Amino acid sequence: MTGIETISAHDLDKYYGDRNVMIIDLRDKEEYDASHFDGAVNIPYEELDIFEALPANKTLVLYCDRGSASLLAARELMQRGYRVKS
């Protein structure tokens, strides 16, 4: 398995509008509602057990408030065959 590609918050802008990418905000709903990256969908880390519902044909770009949840989720998703960045 290769390493997880990490990106900065600044680099997140590069993925906005890319139809081959799904941006996922892993924070809880309250944090997402208060502020989130335009175009991101909210799937709290605790609810990410719906792996089957994620598109296998897109790169998943994950973010959270500190980076630790997104790295854990990225590792889990990579093991299931998804292309991910955190």
Segments predicted by a language model, with ranges:
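Short active-site oxyanion
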Residues: 17-23, 39, 58-60, 82
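Short loop/helix-cap segments at secondary-structure boundaries that form the rim of catalytic
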Residues: 32-38, 51-55, 77
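Catalytic cysteine-centered active loop of the rhodanese-like fold, especially the PTP/DSP P-loop
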Residues: 53-86
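Short hydrophobic/aromatic-enriched beta-strand-loop microsegments
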Residues: 40-47, 81-86
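Short amphipathic alpha-helix with an adjacent loop that forms part of the alpha/beta core around
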Residues: 14-15, 48-57
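Flexible, polar/low-complexity N-terminal or interdomain linker segments that lie immediately upstream
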Residues: 1-34
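Glycine-rich nucleotide phosphate-binding loop and flanking beta-alpha elements
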Residues: 30-32, 49, 70
